[in-house]
């Protein structure tokens, strides 16, 4: 641990020094001294020095308008460089004497444990190979880092790795340091913020770039290592066509609350994915053709290519031509609708079969060592990514479908669908689903919103089945929500089953999830349209915004239990899709612990979850780190499947019922029932300003109104910026305190010790409380909140203090995260750079609110940079 601290501080110091050189060169020594005075003041202030805190405060207050942006940029860059150093610590080269990180050894340790518990090697190999884990990449309004800069940051991490070699001579070390200096200068002189909002297509391209630069390399590497670990433990190999982890995407498919995602955008993104996949395989096949110059071949390969002197190259040449045809057609189809020529690859077998033929031939001819190199990697990619790279989900709000159905029934003279009761809707929808004639005449001319819903359904019907994931219905609350989408898809020409997935988001909808699915499974004809598991999406963000995380977490747990029970009774397989965010307030947290804390039976070999924009970058942005996170998913889903946790004891359920009730009351008393709260929220946080910033393609609000109209992401993002972190903990302080007052401390201790669900919740709560900072929150209040509302901020900070104390009591520590000195070190390192940014942001908000500033003014740009810097420093945003 001490070694890691020393190395981390060494790297941060080096990167900071190189950034300082760059700043001095551009703005002079006097300006750099000002930055240093601010940084040292922050550092001393953190150690309790009143003089240091005063130095920090007076230095920031004294900044001229034209200094605000470069100062904000300096601390933003410091934090991004600290992130790079921290990421590098997670994957740095280790000596043989150093233990492997947990992520690298988790699978082998799990397999040993499973064998010791009596699981047969064949069972382990079979279960591992047929796991179905799907990570759904989503765009994110708070992923503010530009792709250009991300690539430079990745290059900096590579140079840190080069610097880590022990046997470097002084000239080599100087050369690497010089490269680092150049990269940091490039980053400093690159504008870090987009001036215009990204389009949904831009966001999709960002997702494809993560695949191209990281996941494309990580997938074969993690599978190669998993195969090695499996073979060492069981003597068996991972089958060639096993892909335990695949990827889907919402980028270009998620139109919920985003009018910019149209049917045309979805079509464009599907074509871009095909183009990108063909392009990536072409690069692989070009390299393979250069390497596979051998002449000896199997009879099967000879039968395919004839008497060619270079049979492998001949087979790959044909595949290369088809990949080129596919890429060219996808590119041309972006501007006009064209029929696909014969040569275009349509089925994944057409990609896999030539590669398998070469692979098997090499093995048959005694060249297995060649087959098991880049050719095996290409095969693994082809199985994982297929011809379409990712499966695109479509998501739309249930109210849009209801409005479309109302317009249709109104037009047909059947009455208004929206006014019908649930049973009337179900009867009508089932009748029409089973009717062979179309519901709508070809000359029906719907209004714009309905036309867009129908156009999206037509794109779904026209797209290849393998290019699509699920059609997700947000704010679903009834069986008719699912049937309505099935009918709209049928009317649009869909002739195959499609996964239509209700997303249960509010507390009431989560409580009703079981009965809705039970109703659906009991309807005549529904199961024939299912063809596969019943997929249900659990919403973490909106349920937490609605009721606080105490009640939301328990509602999510109980909903999953009920769904498992119903599907087991109905003999239908269940796939739970977890809509988690990056933050604790949106269901985020370490994936490994989260998966192991799911209700027993809810994983069962299948797991689907969203990966949010800013977390995609931290978890999958670099190949080595992506590999570690893929390992964690693999091990956690295998463990949750074969070693599910025991069901909670009745006393624990009673306790959680009471705590959920106390938690939701305390949460809503502040957020919903206090008439001053919304005004305080808008004064104390940058919520209003966030709506103006070009942070993502989706608007920050669903509609005008109070907290309930806000999307969950800006709601949490705003509180994160001020370090109050309110949505992640509010309610827990009351729930836990009241349990202790009732003398139930022993039950709480038992729950934390024996129940993974509760332990994980408390661990995540502790993490967020460690990042919260009442002094920083007070600073925003003093600068921005009117005198008559300051009492509310003081009350919230008292509640924060109560939450910290009760968690310390529960964990038996004197300091939050005392059991994790490494995490404390990472937080402490950042605070010296975060504190000035918070102070600066409060100052910028004050100046911005007191004058009309245009969006591209230095003031607004500095504000945006401060937002980005704080997001980077805290490593989780919305």
UniProtKB/Swiss-Prot annotation:
GO terms for cellular component: cytosol. This is Phosphoenolpyruvate carboxylase. Keywords: Carbon dioxide fixation, Lyase, Magnesium. One of its GO terms (biological process) is carbon fixation. GO terms for molecular function: magnesium ion binding; phosphoenolpyruvate carboxylase activity. The keyword Endoplasmic reticulum does not apply. It holds the Pfam family PEPcase. Belongs to the PEPCase type 1 family. NCBIfam families: PRK00009.1 (NF000584). It catalyses: oxaloacetate + phosphate = phosphoenolpyruvate + hydrogencarbonate. Forms oxaloacetate, a four-carbon dicarboxylic acid source for the tricarboxylic acid cycle. Its cofactor is Mg(2+). Its EC number is 4.1.1.31. The active site is at 140, 545. It comes from the Bacteria. InterPro entries: PEP_COase, PEP_COase_bac/pln-type, PEP_COase_Lys_AS, PEPCASE_His_AS, Pyrv/PenolPyrv_kinase-like_dom. The keyword Oxidoreductase does not apply.
């Amino acid at each position: 641990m001490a070694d890691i601290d020393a190395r981390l501080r060494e790297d941060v110091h080096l990167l900071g020094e190189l950034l300082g050189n760059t700043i001095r060169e551009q703005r002079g020594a006097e300006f750099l001294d000002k930055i240093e005075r601010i940084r040292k003041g922050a550092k001393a202030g953190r150690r309790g020095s009143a003089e240091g805190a005063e130095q920090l405060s007076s230095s920031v207050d004294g900044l001229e308008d034209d200094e605000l942006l470069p100062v904000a940029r300096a601390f933003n860059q410091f934090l991004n460089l600290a992130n790079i150093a921290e990421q590098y610590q997670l994957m740095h080269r280790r000596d043989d004497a150093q233990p492997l990180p947990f992520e690298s050894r988790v699978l082998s340790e799990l397999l040993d444990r499973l064998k010791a518990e009596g699981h047969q090697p064949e069972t382990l190999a079979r279960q591992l190979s047929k796991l179905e884990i799907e990570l759904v990449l989503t765009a994110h309004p708070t992923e503010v880092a530009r792709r250009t800069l991300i690539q430079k940051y990745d290059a900096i991490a590579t140079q840190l790795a080069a610097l880590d070699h022990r046997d470097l001579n002084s000239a080599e070390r100087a050369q690497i340091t010089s490269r680092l200096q150049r990269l940091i200068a490039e980053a400093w002189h690159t504008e870090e913020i987009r001036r215009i909002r990204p389009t949904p297509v831009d966001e999709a391209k960002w997702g494809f770039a993560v695949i191209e630069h990281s996941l494309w390399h990580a997938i074969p590497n993690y599978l190669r290592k998993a195969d090695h670990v499996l073979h060492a433990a069981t003597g068996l190999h991972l089958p060639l066509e096993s892909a335990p982890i695949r990827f889907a995407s919402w980028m270009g498919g998620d139109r919920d609350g985003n009018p910019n995602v149209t049917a045309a955008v979805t079509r464009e993104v599907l074509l871009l994915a095909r183009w990108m996949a063909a392009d990536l395989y072409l690069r692989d096949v070009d390299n393979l053709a250069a390497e596979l110059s051998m002449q000896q071949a199997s009879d099967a390969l000879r039968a395919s290519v004839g008497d060619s002197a270079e049979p492998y190259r001949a087979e790959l040449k044909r595949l290369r031509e088809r990949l080129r045809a596919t890429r060219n057609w996808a590119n041309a189809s972006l501007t006009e609708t064209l029929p696909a020529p014969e040569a275009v690859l349509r089925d994944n077998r057409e990609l896999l079969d030539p590669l398998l033929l070469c692979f098997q031939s090499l093995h048959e001819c005694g060249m297995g060592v060649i087959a098991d190199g880049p050719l095996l990697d290409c095969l693994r990619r082809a199985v994982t990514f297929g011809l379409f790279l990712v499966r695109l989900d479509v998501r739309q709000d249930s109210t849009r479908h209801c409005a479309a159905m109302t317009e249709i029934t109104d037009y047909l003279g059947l009455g208004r669908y929206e006014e019908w009761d649930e049973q009337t809707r179900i009867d009508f929808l089932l009748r029409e689903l089973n009717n062979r004639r179309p519901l709508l005449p070809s000359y029906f001319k719907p209004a714009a919103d309905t036309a867009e819903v129908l156009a999206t359904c037509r794109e779904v019907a026209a797209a290849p089945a393998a290019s699509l994931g699920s059609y997700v219905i947000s704010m679903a609350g009834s069986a008719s929500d699912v049937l309505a989408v099935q009918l709209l898809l049928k009317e649009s020409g869909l002739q195959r089953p499609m996964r239509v997935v209700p997303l249960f988001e509010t507390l009431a909808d989560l409580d009703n999830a079981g009965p809705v699915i039970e109703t659906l499974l009991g309807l005549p004809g529904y199961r024939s349209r299912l063809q596969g598991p019943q997929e249900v999406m659990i919403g973490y963000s909106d349920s937490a915004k609605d009721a606080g995380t105490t009640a939301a977490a328990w509602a999510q747990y109980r909903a999953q239990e009920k769904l498992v029970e119903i599907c087991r009774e109905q003999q239908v397989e269940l796939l739970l899709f977890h809509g988690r965010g990056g933050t604790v307030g949106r269901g985020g947290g370490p994936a490994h612990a989260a998966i192991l804390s799911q209700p027993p039976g809810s994983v069962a070999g299948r797991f689907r979850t969203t990966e949010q924009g800013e977390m995609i970058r931290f978890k999958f942005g670099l190949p080595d780190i992506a590999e570690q996170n893929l390992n964690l998913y693999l091990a956690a889903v295998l463990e949750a499947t074969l070693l599910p946790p025991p069901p909670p004891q009745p006393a624990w359920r009673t306790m959680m019922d009471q705590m959920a009730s106390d938690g939701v009351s305390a949460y809503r008393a502040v957020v919903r029932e206090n008439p001053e709260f919304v005004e305080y929220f808008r004064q104390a946080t940058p919520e209003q300003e966030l709506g103006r910033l070009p942070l993502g393609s989706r608007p920050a609000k669903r509609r005008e109104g109070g907290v309930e109209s806000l999307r969950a992401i800006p709601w949490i993002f705003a509180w994160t910026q001020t370090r109050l972190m309110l949505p992640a903990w509010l309610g827990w302080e009351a729930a836990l305190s009241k349990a202790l007052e009732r003398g139930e401390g022993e039950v709480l201790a038992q729950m934390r010790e024996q129940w993974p669900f509760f332990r994980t919740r408390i661990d995540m709560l502790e993490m967020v409380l460690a990042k919260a900072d009442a002094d920083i929150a007070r600073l925003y209040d003093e600068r921005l909140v009117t005198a008559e509302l300051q009492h509310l901020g003081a009350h919230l900070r008292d509640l924060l203090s109560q939450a910290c104390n009760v968690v310390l009591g529960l964990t038996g520590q004197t300091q939050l995260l005392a059991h994790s000195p490494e995490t404390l070190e990472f937080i402490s390192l950042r605070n010296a750079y975060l504190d000035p940014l918070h102070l600066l942001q409060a100052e910028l908000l004050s100046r911005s609110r007191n004058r009309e500033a245009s969006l591209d003014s230095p003031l607004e740009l500095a504000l945006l940079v401060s937002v980005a810097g704080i997001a980077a420093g805290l490593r989780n945003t919305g």
